[in-house]
Amino acid sequence: MKFAEKLLKHPEFLQLQKRVQEMEQDRIYCHHELSHALDVCRMAWMMYLEDEYKTHLKDYRQKKEAKVEVSEQKYRAEIAGQYITDLQTDDADHTEKPYLNADNMLAKKDQFYVTGLLHDIGRVAQYETGEHHSVAGVRIAEKLLTEIEYPSEWMRETLQIVGVHHGREETDGEFSRMEYYIRRADHLSRNCFFCEASDSCKWKKEERNQTICW
């Protein structure tokens, strides 16, 4: 993950991670240090992969229900064959296809991880100045992303997610797929069922996680 690695080695990113860890040392509620960011990255990516698998499975079942004589073995061979073809075709258009080749998958994973790593990057600014972390986060993230030469075609979506990820409830309007997974992972990564501060937590009882999901 080229850009995630660059971000993890960026001095300002590391400094902010250390600073937020120090500032939240005595905090009884949810923390926002690197371990949480990585939880969000991993959970969001797993959710995405699970849904991709379900999409393939649904497609296969629909073919069977339509009495298309495609055995499971033949179906897998077809997908594998197309996968090999895509790998060998540099200019292939994958945007409308229900599967990802290896290069696309690695690139998407990189984008997921960079976005997850940055989603709470504005916390230090919020603690120090009162500026909301989503607002500060967009400003800081844009600077960091520019300095690691993050792809311009990914920039807008990542900054959008950094700016709105904190909402726990569904809102009007459409989310990008990555935004949907990052928002869910940010919420579901919290172990409310094992939290000693739950009695005074600002989350409503129905919002609290009662078990593990991923």
Residues of each region from the PLM?
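Metal-dependent phosphohydrolase cores
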Residues: M1-W214
